[in-house]
Amino acid sequence: MQRRSFILKTGIIGAAAITAPQLIFAQEQEEEEVTYSIEELMGKADIDLYGKGINLRKEAHDAFKKMKVAAYSAGIDLKIVSSYRNYYRQEGIWERKYLKYTDDQKMKPLNAIDKIIEYSTIPGTSRHHWGTDIDIIDGYQKTSGDVLVPKKFEEGGPFEDLKKWMDENANDFGFYLVYTNNKKRRGFKYEPWHYSYAPISKPMLEQFRGKNIMRLVKEQQLLGGEHFTAGFLKSYIVNNILDINPELL
């Protein structure tokens, strides 16, 4: 009886040992099966957004709220100045800048486009379309003029303490700086205010880069879009969309 009992117990333990990894693998597979429509990826879908003044997907919203509470203990008020931005809002930003540079400043179209993509994305390709990315400042600090200026996040600037705190703590909450201050990085200029919630934005980027981005951009018929050559768009994809913090790839 004792031997039979031992065999039964070891059999149960063995089955559990086999089943547990299988369950974990099944859960991982289920998580990996989350897919995003091209409309979601390009900011043309209506998605559920959470939080007044936050406007992020649920998981990203919850993570930000926890990070915000933690920052309070360091005397910092994490304030979002930009988060979700749909395609049409991005299109408005693009058109306003294009007309400003070509009409007001008399730039040639190609020069105007190069100027725009120093900081602004081509509509349909913005990470802000995903409900995962935020531009932040310290709400406790008073400053005049444009707040999203790299110098204001440096030593002696109003957001110096915010930058230091985020450098030390943001990753613990799943947020990573997107456009880092890496001299070898190309594409968009350094943005010390722009963070992305990696658990969602990484799979979204992976799915987006699997699409024919060149064709999708050309189909939008954007102002100045006739100057989007194949060479320009290839460079834009490699440098502006993909040359980011490696932790987000």
Where are the model-predicted features located?
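Extracytoplasmic cell-surface/polysaccharide-interacting catalytic and binding patches
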Residues: Q2-L249
